[in-house]
Amino acid sequence: MSERLLRPRATSTVFEALERGAALVALESSVLAQGLEPPYNREAARRMTEAVTAVGAIPVITAISRGTPTLGLDDEDLERFLQRDGVRKVSARDLGIAMADGADGATTVAATLALCALGGLEVFATGGIGGVHRDAPFDESADLIELSRTPVIVVCAGAKSILDLPATLERLETLGVPVVGCGTDELPGFFSLSTGLRLTSRLDRPEQIARAWRAHRALGRESAMLVVQPPPADVAIPADIVDAATRAALQAASLAGIRGAAVTPYLLAQIQQRTEGRSVSANLALLEANARLAGQIAVALVEGTP
């Protein structure tokens, strides 16, 4: 017996925008509830939503709000997520359980992709995707498999720097996920400008990316398209500094027995400490830049630029 697919709840602004075919950009909530500590999470929410709005698109923060898959958080709901108390980290596999429990769930990249597919959103901005973990190739983020089967444009600064970036890029190729550089010929290093990992595709204008996406979909491709751009140069951190901080953070996590979903927030906090806060400045700036580019792509899609 087949079940009718659920339609996420949307705020009135998002619902009206969907009805008229306006440009929308999905934003994950996990970076706000687990990735960045207060007050930085509040600043991230403001900068990302303002960046999307400034280019003529509508920001849509995704979440499970008291058990309901939600597109767009009103002020009261957003404040609850920014306070972080009792908010779960929810990946795609956890969505149904969070709904059954009536829980507040902050959506990861994988879960946000799933909600985008249900809600009809084609563009999503985040900081960095998950991938293959260093020294543990069996530990692979659910983001990768979700990217392989969910047709959404994902704008990011590459995979998080704590990961095995060469292995992650190889997995994306195996899974049939196109990776397109915007303003770069290399995979960015999240906090760093480059990694030395060459990309096979580069498109520097939102209109070009929109055309490539339409062609991708016209061919019946069901995967996401990953659009990667480096962090702003004025806040980027040299790769050797990031690598040293990451290795020290991984060692600290191992000694502390950190496991599972707690690993990434722990490592990012350790890197923040070891870079004397530079990683937070870079994270905020790249989140804003990615939101802006995603908004420009969403507008280009709606305008149907030839």
UniProtKB/Swiss-Prot annotation:
Pfam families reported in the protein's UniProt record: Indigoidine_A (PF04227)
Catalytic residues, chain numbering: E28 (proton donor), K160 (nucleophile)
Enzyme class name: lyase
Any one Gene Ontology BP term: nucleobase catabolic process
EC number: 4.2.1.70
Function according to Swiss-Prot or TrEMBL: Catalyzes the reversible cleavage of pseudouridine 5'-phosphate (PsiMP) to ribose 5-phosphate and uracil. Functions biologically in the cleavage direction, as part of a pseudouridine degradation pathway.
Oligomeric form and interacting partners: Homotrimer.
Family per similarity comment: Belongs to the pseudouridine-5'-phosphate glycosidase family.
Protein name: Pseudouridine-5'-phosphate glycosidase
Organism in which the protein naturally occurs: Gemmatimonas aurantiaca (strain DSM 14586 / JCM 11422 / NBRC 100505 / T-27)
Gene behind this protein: psuG
